[in-house]
Amino acid sequence: MEVRDINVFELTIELMKIPSVSGNEQKVGAFIGEYLGSLGYDVELQEVVDGRKNVIAVASDNPELFFSTHMDTVPPFIPPTEDREKIYGRGSCDAKGIIASQIAAAEQLRAAGETRIGLLFTVDEEESSLGSKAANDLPVSAKCRYMINGEPTDNDLGIGSKGSLRMRLSTSGKAAHSAYPEMGESAIEKMVEVLSDVIGADLPGDEFFGDTTLNVGTISGGLKTNVVPPSAEAGLHIRLATDDGPVIERLNEIVGDRGELETMSCSLPVKMLEVEGFKQKVVRFTTDIPQLTNWGTPLLLGPGSILDAHTSHEYVKKEDLVAAVELYVNLGRRLLDGQVKRHR
């Protein structure tokens, strides 16, 4: 089995050149699968939906440690550029720089004789986590003792991540000619009133995870400016610091009979392993980890800042990519050698 010294900058840029907005991960998945196969890994491409495939690669038949992250990005595609210090463009920190760092770390471990390793790269993390949900049923998951999931954490160890609750709020009215608004009922005016109360709501929080926060991400409604709007809809994204039950109950109390709330998707907050010697923090975002319950004990670590992800100026520092490789190798060795004790 060939072992390579991976140039993490070059690999990051090669991955970024391949557009992979959620729903279109086919080409980047094929590239990664072929690349890992050329290194001698046993590669499986797991069909998820519409030709979109997870990539699973193992260095032996006893993969106790997996590195994992996602291949999809948010829109729009932004081609890569670089200077001496940074790599810019879509996926630089979320999460193609992480893919490159994890592959480079796996190769360093193999070069040192460690073969109890695997790699899992999923589709659809930025949407509904269809990839991780499908991966959770793979038989190889039973062999995994530890999974290091990669997201931009500033190379700090994430010891907790908030949950994610997506909801749809709908209001109904009665259409009428806009010259006679008293003959109708405006669903948009009703929506504005309800959202004002929802945005100002005091939602249940948690001492460990912090506050539960709410974002109104989308609003739509109405037919034309000369028609009293009969319907309106808003998309809510709540970052959960608690179980979803108390939050949904509180929101239903606020909305009352003025509208309808529907849960679109939900993943709960997760506490993860604490490891001595690493900078540690709780992150506000969610990951694939809640869907990968069969993949051993989860850890969260990756280069780049979540504040730069999903932006027009997305970038990752080259020094952070190099540091991430070293951190992944160090953490992987300690986990495989039994040098990490569970704190939570």
Question: Which residues make up each language-model segment?
Answer:
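Metal-dependent amide/peptide-bond hydrolase catalytic core
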Residues: 3, 20, 27, 152, ...
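Acidic-glycine-rich active-site phosphate/pyrophosphate-binding loop
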Residues: 71-83, 143-144, 159-170
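Acidic/histidine-rich catalytic neighborhood of metal-dependent amide-processing enzymes
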Residues: 100-166, 206-207
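Structural motif corresponding to alpha-helix initiation and N-cap regions
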Residues: 51-52, 129, 285-286
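Acidic/His- and Gly-rich active-site-bordering loop/insert found
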Residues: 1-91, 114, 300
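Alpha-helical metal-binding/catalytic segments enriched in His/Glu/Asp
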Residues: 67, 84-129, 167-171, 181-201, ...
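Residue-level marker for buried hydrophobic side chains located in beta-strands
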Residues: 65-67, 148, 174
